[in-house]
Amino acid sequence: MKRKIFLWHQKLEVFLKIEDEEIINRLKNVLRLKEGESVFFLNNFSEEGEYELLDSKKFIFKRKNLKERDLVPQRKINLYVSLIRKENFELILEKGTELGVYLFQPVISQRSSLKIKEIPSRWFKIIGSALEVTNWKHTPEIKEIKTLGEILKENKENFYLAHKEGEKINLKKMPQEINLLIGPEGGFSEEEEKMIREKTKFISLGDFDSRTETACLVFLSLLNFS
């Protein structure tokens, strides 16, 4: 398996000097990279390059080859996720990236269990790490946190809510770009559901019932790989 490391906002020039302490730690203590050995770097500009370590003290690399990552998923999926428990939300970020999500939109709802107002830097690291095991061209964007009311006012087209009482998903009828809303543990409140029904279409997995994060990943798998 290729040894890959994701670099945010760094172009893959012919010579590359790594200064990020976390990445240096991975190179030294996890990958145990020695001078003359190679590693693959990728970034959020769809680039992937193979690099040889020239200097193990200053962590200077020379590029051996460069390519553009060109794999695109079957559908463009914008995932609107209620702020559920931290570990479950981060699981959706990780696996959603691996499954080809185009955009993540965190949503504050009445039953949100994760109480934050700003995007943690850790979320970007999770996405970067997830991309290391894929060949996707696109790096998912994380939008600023919004309330459910703000989201619904945007009047998105092809907006769907994953809901156990919804119509069973028919993949042949699903559009190429999808806005998929995932509720919190316990679901949305009655008041919220009433607002959502006016703006979205409810879809389900039929008799399949599971945790929020599991249902979300099943939907993504079906939409992009069926």
Explain the meaning of each model-derived region.
Residues 1-68:
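N-terminal positively charged helical leader segments and presequences
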Residues 10, 20-21, 44, 83, ...:
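Fold-independent oxyanion-binding glycine-rich loops
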Residues 190-226:
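Structured adenosyl-cofactor binding patch, chiefly the S-adenosyl-L-methionine
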Residues 1-15, 154-156, 170-176, 198, ...:
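Short, Lys/Arg-enriched, disordered terminal segments
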Residues 70-158:
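RNA substrate-binding interface of SAM-dependent RNA methyltransferases
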